[in-house]
From Swiss-Prot:
It comes from Corynebacterium glutamicum (strain ATCC 13032 / DSM 20300 / JCM 1318 / BCRC 11384 / CCUG 27702 / LMG 3730 / NBRC 12168 / NCIMB 10025 / NRRL B-2784 / 534). Residues 408-565 are annotated as: Oligomerization domain. Mg(2+) 1 binds at Q290, E304. The gene is carB. This is Carbamoyl phosphate synthase large chain. It comes from the Bacteria.
Amino acid sequence: MPKRSDINHVLVIGSGPIVIGQACEFDYSGTQACRVLKEEGLRVTLINSNPATIMTDPEMADHTYVEPIEPEYIDKIFAKEIEQGHPIDAVLATLGGQTALNAAIQLDRLGILEKYGVELIGADIDAIERGEDRQKFKDIVTTIGGESARSRVCHNMEEVHETVAELGLPVVVRPSFTMGGLGSGLAYNTEDLERIAGGGLAASPEANVLIEESILGWKEFELELMRDTADNVVVICSIENVDALGVHTGDSVTVAPALTLTDREFQKMRDQGIAIIREVGVDTGGCNIQFAINPVDGRIITIEMNPRVSRSSALASKATGFPIAKMAAKLAIGYTLDEITNDITGETPAAFEPTIDYVVVKAPRFAFEKFVGADDTLTTTMKSVGEVMSLGRNYIAALNKALRSLETKQQGFWTKPDEFFAGERATDKAAVLEDLKRPTEGRLYDVELAMRLGASVEELYEASSIDPWFLAELEALVQFRQKLVDAPFLNEDLLREAKFMGLSDLQIAALRPEFAGEDGVRTLRLSLGIRPVFKTVDTCAAEFEAKTPYHYSAYELDPAAESEVAPQTEREKVLILGSGPNRIGQGIEFDYSCVHAALELSRVGYETVMVNCNPETVSTDYDTADRLYFEPLTFEDVMEVYHAEAQSGTVAGVIVQLGGQTPLGLADRLKKAGVPVIGTSPEAIDMAEDRGEFGALLNREQLPAPAFGTATSFEEARTVADEISYPVLVRPSYVLGGRGMEIVYDEASLEDYINRATELSSDHPVLVDRFLDNAIEIDVDALCDGDEVYLAGVMEHIEEAGIHSGDSACALPPMTLGAQDIEKVREATKKLALGIGVQGLMNVQYALKDDILYVIEANPRASRTVPFVSKATGVNLAKAASRIAVGATIKDLQDEGMIPTEYDGGSLPLDAPIAVKEAVLPFNRFRRPDGKTLDTLLSPEMKSTGEVMGLANNFGAAYAKAEAGAFGALPTEGTVFVTVANRDKRTLILPIQRLALMGYKILATEGTAGMLRRNGIECEVVLKASDIREGVEGKSIVDRIREGEVDLILNTPAGSAGARHDGYDIRAAAVTVGVPLITTVQGVTAAVQGIEALREGVVSVRALQELDHAVKA
């Protein structure tokens, strides 16, 4: 049936900030949807609070609202669009993850959809509830003749205990309507049950959890399906988890297609999947269904479904080349599958199920090093922060490629000594087998080590529950390793076999010391003519010719195998190196810059080539660049892509400055290997990173910087610290996201840091800087063409210096800097950019203290603030930087209208909106091994996974929006609990007085209460948790927070051990029940301004396209 004629205007709901369980795969799906709907002639309005997304670019929709994804803001958007003569007909909520689905349910329940006569498309409320509500879904599985695990939905702890009495322990706890397994877990005893089920009830928007019999150790599978209004159903992809049930699918290594199913099992699962999608009622889009199979008797159980595009959908799309989100958007507006053409072949309809003739492996990326003390056991709550995908001709080759794509310290098997990851267990088979019973991020390395120590497949299956087929594949690799080690010399056949199994030159060199590193292996390999061939992802196993060049590398045993890379055009090519897996410190913001570079350079006549391995991103969509290579971002893999491209045409250069630290780290070696690195040169990159050279530049230009020194031992570090005086900031050189960075207040802490963190310094010394207490931190993005500098954005941090810039809220334009301060910033930035030799983007961090502007650091690359600054000022910095890299000047770009001439980021027009960026932190995902929450205090070590933006005409309203978008909506009435360190008491009198005058009830601990009362502020004294521990009778503040009696917490950390412990208890309780928590003085002041704006009702919505200075597409 053709497109519906009654839908002319669609509101697409995005997924908001990047959080664990919901990452940039929804930017990818939402971007596809917006493009499709606009191509179909519909008017598109978008709401998404995340500025770091491609979908929030003004050209992606007719009206883009960067607003919190909350019913009250969506209500304002409906009203505003009617006011402007563009009433919204339908809402598409199936492409924005769980956030969008939950928003759609709230809009329905609050009567907002009915009020404006708007319908839901993609999946209606009934289908969403039938798929998401645990009991309803369980009933559907029974109706179609399927089987679920024995379970019961519980609404309170009493029902939970009754159910467990029936099922017995252990049990699985699964809350309804959450994503990434938030609030779920495995309860082995009553204590676990109380903690996990209590947290699950709090995490579920419906306040219910499913308590389910344990089916740990079963095999887990997923099917990705689509259905249209004519009842056509296609199964796009099957996915198998290498880890057994009990590890969240987002934390497991997964493979596509499923490799260990019998044909009978697959057909049975497929039949059940089709029956479920029909019974649930998803008839205009896609869904994902998870199954478990008992390895002993083949019994199949249906676990759950997502009646929407999910994280697995993005993986299935990239794995098969079948654009699920694009198809889902077309189905939502009335098309049927047989009416839609497959883009990749250009001739088959979407009703043809994809066929793949390769193996895909997805591997998760973790960040436990950022959360000291966190329990690293993998359970049903997702903890990974990113993922990679690799494609190979066989499982082991794809697995090896995936492991080196992760960019962890261990770059694949054998690249580090066994002691590096196994410690004392490196020679103890029994200890390794024992450890394998507890799933952790390094378990595949443990499996491989245990095999070398003599463990059999049976023993390993018993310990890990990993299917024997996967274990046998690893066993074959271990046997080949021995062959490689034992060979008297490395001949052509052996080297070909090693490469066929996916081993990198680095892995081979680790086993053959005569090569003295990977360069030796590379020289031999090239002399023997052993290079990869590049295969094409075509959705049809080469049955039809692919029209879109989407490639992966493979080494064949046959020397005559041919590559499938053909010249597309006569245009010069530019390779853009992506940012690899999301991790804390390097996420979607860098992908944003890579995507814009690809689109802009393609527009001005270059053939763009994207190299990346992250399946969640827009950059790895097959139609972002002219050609896509799904490859690891290592020197070896990038060089092979460069060689393949150079064989088929002229390569103008490689851009390394947009993808974060990953490609930047390759710049030097690429240049030495003869690859033209365009944009900022590798020498300039090194100069900015080298403390000696950079310090010399600062001296020449007379730019102040905090006193610093470098040290390679504790003794040296102590000498430096004594000279420049405490507190000092210590860190390894060459880091991103503040990894390994700490503020140290005394010698004992310094010694502790050196003992713990020197391992991070990777042959670079530890840096010791004077820490500027109570300074204002300033973040600057700028463009430089070698002669001229454009100041793109000046951001003032709301938190004081000492909190990582990625975790601090910031405002643009700056709120407290005067014209003189900004002029100092402009002059210093110009001197730095020209002195370093920047060609493109540069980010500088400054600290302003006592009217002196100190340079903290300069990074000659795209920063994580580029998308935020671009949205706030209307100047697309990534596009501009890509043009400068290929020779354009700032004057050229001003003449084109890409960069304004009448103002810059330091002198924005008076009517420019105020933009506030706020970080989103994942503390609700991590616990200590004893089950307690991690402390939520911010530090120089970055911990946030994502960000949101608040836009308004005044700071208070912008800050309030940013907090609401970051899941910390400020209360407009109620009870505020205040407990602050002595040093902060004087500063906080005024903001707390304003709260009291607005009618808030103030609770305070004894010391803080005395100070407040002396200043005429009425408050109630509360007991601390330590008072109760010491025998004082009554209810502690921690209990009151847990029982919902507190609406906002203001807690600045104190120095003494007892006070720190009380502070931790308070912050942990706040995280558990989701009460907004502010831990800095500046944050309190900003929050009071935000609350005032909310109470005065001055918070309105405004589309990016309406801003006078927005760059029009």
